[in-house]
């Protein structure tokens, strides 16, 4: 059977990764830090993925979960994978888009340098039993907190349930290449 080992580590502290064995077949990186502190968030998100990849460089595939928050705001037009990047979450999460872009950059660099088969998956609006953006909107409504909408209406989102992206993990791992699949 295919098992998973969940390991808790502080990716901002490279030394905390010393607990990791080096014989993983696959690594799935769902980690994200949104503290608002640029130094810490860049260390945890960008340097952290690099340190993790260096520690696990003999894997069959590395899957890094990113976000569509990396894209520059472009109105109502759908985004292609090669759409311009930008800091579109700055108002609510000052460090989020930038640290996600930085993490993707470090992920690509290490994959190329170490020849690690890698896929970067940019999820849109993930949600599930443990919460997500829509859950936070419901909490805001319960508390009478207004939900800001972008003035360029309508506001389109592509919710993605955890069951759906988990089902795709084997395909995302199979698509991994050292050139990096996005």
Model-found features: residue ranges?
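Conserved Rossmann-fold NAD(P)-dependent oxidoreductase catalytic core, especially the SDR/UDP-sugar
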Residues: 51-95
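Glycine-rich NAD(P)-binding loop of the Rossmann-fold in SDR/ketoreductase-type enzymes
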Residues: 12, 26, 40-51, 90, ...
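Short, hydrophobic alpha-helical segments
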Residues: 173-177
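NAD(P)H-binding glycine-rich loop region in Rossmannoid oxidoreductase-like domains
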Residues: 4-46
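Conserved mid-core alpha-helix of short-chain dehydrogenase/reductase
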Residues: 16, 47, 51-55, 106, ...
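Conserved catalytic-core motifs of eukaryotic protein kinase domains, centered on the activation segment
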Residues: 34-42, 73-77, 132
């Amino acid at each position: 059977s295919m098992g998973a080992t969940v390991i808790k580590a502080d990716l901002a502290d490279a030394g905390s990764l010393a607990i990791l064995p080096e014989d993983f077949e696959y690594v799935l990186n769902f980690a994200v830090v949104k503290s608002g502190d640029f130094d810490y968030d860049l260390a945890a998100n960008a340097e952290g993925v690099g340190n993790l990849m260096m520690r696990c460089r003999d894997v069959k595939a590395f899957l890094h979960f990113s976000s569509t928050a990396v894209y520059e705001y472009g109105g109502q037009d759908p985004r292609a994978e090669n759409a311009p990047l930008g800091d579109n979450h700055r108002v609510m999460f000052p460090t989020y888009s930038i640290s996600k872009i930085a993490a993707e950059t470090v992920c690509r660099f290490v994959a190329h340098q170490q020849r690690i088969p890698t896929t970067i998956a940019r999820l849109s609006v993930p949600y599930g039993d443990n919460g997500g953006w829509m859950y936070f909107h419901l909490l805001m409504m319960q508390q009478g907190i207004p939900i800001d909408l972008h003035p360029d209406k309508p506001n389109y989102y592509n919710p993605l349930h955890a069951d759906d992206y988990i089902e795709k993990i084997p395909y995302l791992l199979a698509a991994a290449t050292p050139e990096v699949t996005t």
